[in-house]
């Protein structure tokens, strides 16, 4: 049985990754289990300089999920390379750096700082960030701005570039198209949905920033729908990485059958640290029960079965 997938010229031992912002940089999780069993680790977001994040409270539970407004807290790319990277560089799995910035220049600088870090095999762009030079509009909410960002980064880097698309748009396929046209190597669907929770006793929003990103089981059907739509239009042109609402192997298989070549387990890591391993095991058992020898047979199969 073959669970491996080759994406953007890189072979992954299995299609189960962990999502950015839910796994730190892999150091803490490595004390709980052997993270080399994972297909890949996507790091917590990295910016050029250290960020302290938003005021608290910045996490609140909701039915079937959670809202977060962490504010992209991170040590900055140089401190990451100096203090954290040495602890992960010998782990036998791939690491993908989640990267963000407030300007095109910052995105480019962060990626360039990581070009010589061999353990980092690709970049995942978080484009749900405000462009301070364009009046604060999110990079991922304007197709022209997004296309320019992808084009500018691709011109400078050698490693594959994945773009994590926002679901908070009218037509996600429009944004997928501009990423493809400007050289993106992969698409990650989806980022969190904007939401709010109000404390009726305090008469105000629970989060200090009022709104936050909704993740967890509640967003599974939305992620599956968007993956299906993008695969339907562009599945033969670019690989899709599915993320959003994956708690079990069954959830992961919905992503895969909709068109994802690999999946990321996110929020589930907070309450079940072994969730990614259980997803891997579940996919293996499913393939055995269905007499499927190669995982790749399942990618996008929902488009081929009537």
UniProtKB/Swiss-Prot annotation:
Record carries keyword Oxidoreductase: yes
Catalysed reaction, written as an equation: (S)-dihydroorotate + fumarate = orotate + succinate
The UniProt record lists the keyword Oxidoreductase: yes
Pfam families named among the record's database cross-references: DHO_dh
Cofactor: FMN
InterPro entries: Aldolase_TIM, DHO_dehydrogenase, DHOD_1B, Dihydroorotate_DH_1, Dihydroorotate_DH_1_2, Dihydroorotate_DH_cat, Dihydroorotate_DH_CS, Dihydroorotate_DH_I
Sorted UniProt keywords: Cytoplasm, Flavoprotein, FMN, Oxidoreductase, Pyrimidine biosynthesis
Family of the protein in this entry: Belongs to the dihydroorotate dehydrogenase family. Type 1 subfamily.
Cited NCBIfam families: PRK07259.1 (NF005574), pyrD_sub1_fam (TIGR01037)
Described purpose of this protein according to its UniProt entry: Catalyzes the conversion of dihydroorotate to orotate with fumarate as the electron acceptor.
Protein name: Putative dihydroorotate dehydrogenase A (fumarate)
Organism listed in the record: Aquifex aeolicus (strain VF5)
Organismal lineage: Bacteria, Pseudomonadati, Aquificota, Aquificia, Aquificales
Gene: pyrD
């Amino acid at each position: 049985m073959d669970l491996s997938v080759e994406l953007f010229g890189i072979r992954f031992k299995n299609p189960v990754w962990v999502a950015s912002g839910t796994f730190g940089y892999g150091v803490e999780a490595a004390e709980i289990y052997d993270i080399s069993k994972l297909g890949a680790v996507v790091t917590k977001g990295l910016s050029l300089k250290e960020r302290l994040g938003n005021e608290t409270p910045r996490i609140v539970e909701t039915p079937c999920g959670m809202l977060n407004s962490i504010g992209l807290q991170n040590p900055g790319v140089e401190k990451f390379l100096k203090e954290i990277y040495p602890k992960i560089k010998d782990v036998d799995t791939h690491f993908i750096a989640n990267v963000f910035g407030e300007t095109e220049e910052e995105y480019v600088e962060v990626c360039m700082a990581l070009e010589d870090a061999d353990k980092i095999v690709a970049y995942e762009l978080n484009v749900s960030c405000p462009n301070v030079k364009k009046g604060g509009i999110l990079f991922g909410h304007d197709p022209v701005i997004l296309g320019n960002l992808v084009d500018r980064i691709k011109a400078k880097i050698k490693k594959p570039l994945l773009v994590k698309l926002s679901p908070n748009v009218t037509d996600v396929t429009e944004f997928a198209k501009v990423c493809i046209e400007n050289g993106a190597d992969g698409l990650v669907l989806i980022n969190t949905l904007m939401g709010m929770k109000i404390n009726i006793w305090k008469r105000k929003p629970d989060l200090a920033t009022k709104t936050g990103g909704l993740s967890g089981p509640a967003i599974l059907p939305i992620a599956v729908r968007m993956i299906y739509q993008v695969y339907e239009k562009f599945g033969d042109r670019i690989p899709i990485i599915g993320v959003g609402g994956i708690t079990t192997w069954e959830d992961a298989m919905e992503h895969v059958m909709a068109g994802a070549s690999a999946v990321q387990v996110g929020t589930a890591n907070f309450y079940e640290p072994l969730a990614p391993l259980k997803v891997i095991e579940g996919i293996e058992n499913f393939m055995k029960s269905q007499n499927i020898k190669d995982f790749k047979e399942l990618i996008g199969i929902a488009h081929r079965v009537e």
